[in-house]
Regions:
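Membrane-interfacial amphipathic/re-entrant helices at transmembrane-helix boundaries
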Residues: 1-54, 88-96, 173
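Alpha-helical transmembrane segments within multi-pass membrane transporters and channels
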Residues: 90-131
């Protein structure tokens, strides 16, 4: 047990966590609203998209490269999927949207992977270029603009509340969407992959816990 505790405090993460807690306490003292239930729910909700992006980028970093195209790739996948389903007047559940978006993302990722993995080009240079290509496809080919309407299934999933919290002091209610579960599942899968598969031995050394 002592060895595990010692290993934990030899890394940077516990100290970053403590700094965040201390900052939260300072804000709580000044405003009295930081540790309220609805604010915690808002923070968790705000973590979903950055958290998914961070996990994906982390995998690229431990593989020895850096991907700067992922915001453009994600935007193109999401926009193309939404536009396609709108054009087809699709009114089914959100599962098809996930399948299409993942397929588009896989194709775009394979495009990057070909130049990086097979042609041995610098990952940062390749993804800088592909980011411009993806943005060009969105703006030029798809003529992207703000979508005021999205398919019913996507809207229902995005607005469905996994958890709600109300601040009794001011009456504000916050909603944690079901996409938070996706973030938790992705974190769990990555934890397993990085600690209990050959990936952890090939690219980095992580203790099994």
């Amino acid at each position: 047990m002592n060895k595990k505790v010692k290993k934990i405090f030899q890394s940077n993460e516990p100290y970053i966590f403590l700094i965040i807690i201390l900052l939260g306490i300072v804000v709580q003292i000044r405003s009295g609203q930081f540790f309220t239930a609805n604010n915690i729910v808002d923070l968790l909700s705000a973590m979903i998209v950055p958290g998914l992006f961070a996990i994906a980028e982390f995998m690229a970093l431990i593989a020895g490269g850096i991907d700067v195209s992922f915001p453009a790739l994600a935007s193109l996948s999401a926009y193309a999927t939404t536009k396609f389903l709108l054009d087809k007047n699709y009114e089914g559940n959100v599962l098809l949207a996930f399948v299409i978006a993942i397929a588009i993302g896989a194709v775009l990722g394979a495009f990057n992977g070909y130049f990086i993995g097979y042609l041995n080009l610098n990952a940062m240079i390749v993804t800088l270029g592909s980011a411009s290509i993806f943005q060009g496809i969105m703006q030029g080919t798809l003529r992207a603009n703000q979508l005021s309407v999205i398919p019913p299934g996507m809207k229902s999933f995005g607005t469905a509340a996994f958890l709600t919290a109300t601040n009794k002091a001011n009456g504000l209610t916050s909603i944690l969407p079901y996409t938070f579960i996706i973030l938790v599942l992705v974190c769990a899968v990555m934890h397993f992959v990085l600690h209990y598969t050959t990936v952890s031995y090939t690219h980095l050394t992580l203790p099994t816990i």
